[in-house]
């Protein structure tokens, strides 16, 4: 079985720093992750409409700033609610709400980024391929 495709919507301020540090530190994680840098995770719902699970990703995660550290003040809190809502919708559609998750991290949390990738890869393997995948 091929590695599942994981889309990671990562905040430019925090999540991207963690992903970059993981790469420069040569930390190991599956190469099937597709990082997508966004200005703020608060814009997540817009990006999910055009990418991610509707386009066939097996799992999606959002890597945003830690609570009270968002450069845009409330972006990470608003996306947390959107992720919860999206989980519920995916469950109702029979796709599986566990295909999406929110992780909070700082730019120095390279280990947390690799843990998020590994966790979502394991989840996607357990859930099987995205039923919307063409």
From Swiss-Prot:
Cofactor(s) demanded: [2Fe-2S] cluster
Cofactor: how bound: Binds 1 [2Fe-2S] cluster.
Annotated disulfide bonds: none
Keywords for this protein: 2Fe-2S, Electron transport, Iron, Iron-sulfur, Metal-binding, Oxidoreductase, Transport
Superkingdom: Archaea
EC number: 1.12.99.-
GO molecular function: 2 iron, 2 sulfur cluster binding; metal ion binding; oxidoreductase activity
Pfam name, any one: FlpD
Major enzyme class: oxidoreductase
Presence of the UniProt keyword Thylakoid in the record: no
InterPro entries recorded: MvhD/FlpD
Quaternary structure, from the entry: The F420-non-reducing hydrogenase vhu is composed of four subunits; VhuA, VhuD, VhuG and VhuU.
Family: Belongs to the MvhD/VhuD family.
Name listed for the protein in its UniProt record: F420-non-reducing hydrogenase vhu iron-sulfur subunit D
Origin organism lineage: Archaea, Methanobacteriati, Methanobacteriota, Methanomada group, Methanococci
Gene: vhuD
């Amino acid at each position: 079985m091929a590695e599942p495709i994981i889309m990671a919507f990562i905040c430019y301020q925090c999540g991207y720093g963690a992903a970059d540090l993981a790469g420069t530190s040569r930390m190991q994680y599956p190469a099937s992750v597709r990082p997508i840098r966004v200005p703020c995770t608060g814009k997540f719902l817009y990006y999910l409409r055009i990418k991610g699970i509707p386009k066939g990703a097996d799992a999606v995660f959002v890597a945003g700033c830690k609570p009270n550290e968002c450069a845009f003040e409330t972006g990470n809190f608003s996306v947390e609610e959107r992720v919860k809502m999206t989980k519920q919708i995916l469950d109702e559609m029979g796709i599986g709400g566990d295909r999406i998750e929110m992780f909070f991290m700082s730019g120095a949390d390279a280990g947390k980024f690799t843990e998020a990738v590994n966790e979502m890869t394991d989840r996607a393997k357990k859930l099987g391929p995205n039923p919307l995948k063409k």
